[in-house]
Amino acid sequence: MLAVGCASSQALGMQGHSNPNRELLDAAALCRELVPEGSVEAFLADHRQELFPDELFVDLFPSGRGRPSVPSDVIATVMVLQALEGLSDRDAARALRDRISWKVACGLSLDDEGFHHSVLTYWRARLRTSERPERIFDAVRAVVDATGVLQGKNRRALDSTLLDDAVATQDTVTQLVSAIRRVRRMIPGAAQAPLVAHDYEAGPKPLIAWDDPVAKQQLVSALVGDAHKLIQALESPELTVEQQEAVGLLALVAGQDVEPGEAEGTWRIAERVAPDRVISTVDPEARHMHKSRSSYRDGYKAHVAVEPETGLVTACSLTPANAADGPAGVALIADEDPGLEVLADSAYGSGEVRAALEQTKHRAVIKPIPLHTAVLGGFTIDDFAIDTSAGTATCPRGTTVAITPHGNAVFGPRCRDCPLRERCTRSRTGRAIRLHPHHDLLLAARRQAKTGGFKDSYRRHRPMVERSIAWLVARGHRRVRYRGVARNQLGLSMRVAAINLRRLINLGLDHDGGWVLQT
């Protein structure tokens, strides 16, 4: 039986192993028929030790001494089921204690009380700090490779989705007060600095008339002044890494939302928003991102690459919400063999992404970024004849100019008496075009998008990635559970592993001396 104690009594020590001998009240022996065939629980009951062998986790227990841990195949099974159902650690531990299907999946007896929920936190910490934090995802991916289900399937669809942060977004005042308090708490002597804007030992926010803009500006100015005083008082090379990070975060929040005021030494809220603005001192890695002018989220972004015929996720990554889709998408297929057909929407349509795919000998089936016109309904750059090899640009009227070394084609005074001027430019100085460094690639992409082959392939194969993302965020997974990129990357990889395993089971996964698909 598993112990029910806390993590420190269960998880420390040497690696535990599942007992190969069945106990008197073995759940699988007594209740296996209650677990539906074809379910993830039934599959794990039969094959969890082949999927998650002890050797997969042996490096997490280098000492080989002490009390045995919870068996690794049991922990991995619980983590997969937890990710599949979107349960908290507490609810997952409760499910292991009172659900027959979970006991069957983990090979426990009916009277086994399971383990304390903090054991899951401990194991995630060990995984995260190990050399292979995503080994459960890798184990499922190894099964994918062993079955050969992806053999000959040379398409990958890329997409991303925004995930809500696990903490509340903070305003400027809250961030400043929180960051100052953190520094005062973490660094000995910091509380002695003469700060005047607020009583930082008090719990509530500063007491002012919050509907008075002048009072709010004065408070912000005073808080920024306190932050600068505190930073200057702590310029010491003897700070620990954690203390340096706290001071660095204080410096960041003290500068990201403000600009110098009219009077010397004063500060005011800036009208612009910092492009990489920290939205919370509780989770400094989360970011703000607009999906459209009216739709936005604070948190992170999940990126996936999907094989569109099977729906299997071949790679995943997590970034702050404001990270660009293109570079993340290219990284997802970096380890793939050349010759893929890569499908994606226009968020991946930059010249840099197309150049990277061309360099790695992949074929892009990516929607082009829409062109903008200087005049509504007027000429776009595609109406100009651009010859990059000759270094010339010819306008719709037939006027040709040289392209400058910086990629500019300036028609200037040649537009003065042009009968097509109203369809081309409103500028008094005439039309000027700035060519993208990858102009030829972008032009080819726009032409490709008009072909029947592009449209057929895109419509047929790309929708699966959107379905995969719908599976990914179901059961409450639109909101991340943890703080920081590393923790949530591990959570994302666990969720993807669970989804991939369920998909493989639906495709007929079995183990008969090796992993095979029976369909």
What annotation goes with each model-predicted range?
Residues 91, 112-114, 120-519:
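Anion-binding and metal-coordination hotspots
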Residues 54-55, 99, 103, 475:
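A short secondary-structure junction motif
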Residues 1-26, 511-519:
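Intrinsically disordered, low-complexity and often Lys/Arg-enriched segments
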Residues 35-80, 84-85, 435-437, 441:
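Basic, short loop/linker segments at the boundary and entry of helix-turn-helix/winged-helix-like folds
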Residues 59-62, 75-81, 105, 314-317, ...:
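Glycine- and acidic
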Residues 60-74, 85-136:
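Trp/Phe/Arg-rich N-terminal binding region typifying the photolyase-homology
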Residues 30:
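Carboxylate/His-rich catalytic cores and anion/metal-binding grooves
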